[in-house]
Amino acid sequence: ETAAAVIQENEDGSAKILSSIVSSQIEEHEKFGGVVPELAARAHVENIDFIIKKALKVSKLGIEKIDGIAATAGPGLMVCLTVGLNIGKSIAAFADKPFVAVNHLEGHALSPGLEKEIKFPYLLLLISGGHSQYLLVNDINKYEQLGTTIDDALGEAFDKTAKMLDLGYPGGPNIEKFSKLGDKNFYKLPEPIINRAGCNLSFAGLKTAVLRESKKINGDLQLRYNLAASFQNTVNKILKKKRKRQ
């Protein structure tokens, strides 16, 4: 997605989202079964100017009222991130405003407290794309990693499972959608390293088990739904159990 938002900091330190505009690229990438970096970057270039202007319009603020500009600096696809960074820096320079490069994962870690007060420290399960982590968020810029994946990221496992079951792109939402039509207890799937101490995760074995079962389906639609539901249910059980091992 290409996105822009205007955030207001209130006197008490809380925040208010004045506008949040998102342009999705899902239809563009759906035909390829995943994100094509070059196409994504081109779409960002085509959409970002309009998105920023609309965010300002919805917020009812002119650029002169904005105190600072922030843009995601990583982690992520640099060919895409560069688009936002360049335009963010350009706007900041033109408007004589400070520019802040934001860590993508730190944004996820702190966003739960954007409009609702959450007191530090708190335990965070961060599962975003190629990242699967349990973090102890002690304060802004103070994070302790309690566990991470030792092989595949959960996002990859969802995408690969959706592909194995021919459920289409994007994998996560489609698995969630079709899981509602299946029996989550139909397949007994492995929960890798679930009894190992600590909060580390592993999804390679689960992904292999799904591949093995998917080859036995032979086009049976209900079995595909059952396997999707069983996969999602197994993931939920793994995450809940590991949460208690911190």
Listing of model-derived features with the role each one plays in the protein:
Residues 1-65, 71, 75, 108:
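N-terminal beta-alpha supersecondary unit
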Residues 2-8, 124, 132-136:
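Short beta-strand scaffold segments in enzyme catalytic cores
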Residues 20, 62, 176-246:
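A contiguous, well-structured pocket-lining segment that forms one wall/lid of small-molecule binding clefts
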Residues 20-22, 70-72, 103, 123-128, ...:
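Short beta-strand segments
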Residues 59-65, 87-104:
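Nucleotide and nucleotide-moiety/phosphate-recognizing core
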Residues 71-95:
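Short Gly/Thr/Asp-enriched flexible loops that form oxyanion-binding sites at enzyme active sites
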Residues 101-123:
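Conserved phosphate-binding catalytic cores of ATP/NTP-utilizing and phosphoryl-transfer enzymes
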Residues 128, 139-183, 207-208, 212-217:
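Glycine-rich phosphate-binding loop plus the immediately following alpha-helix
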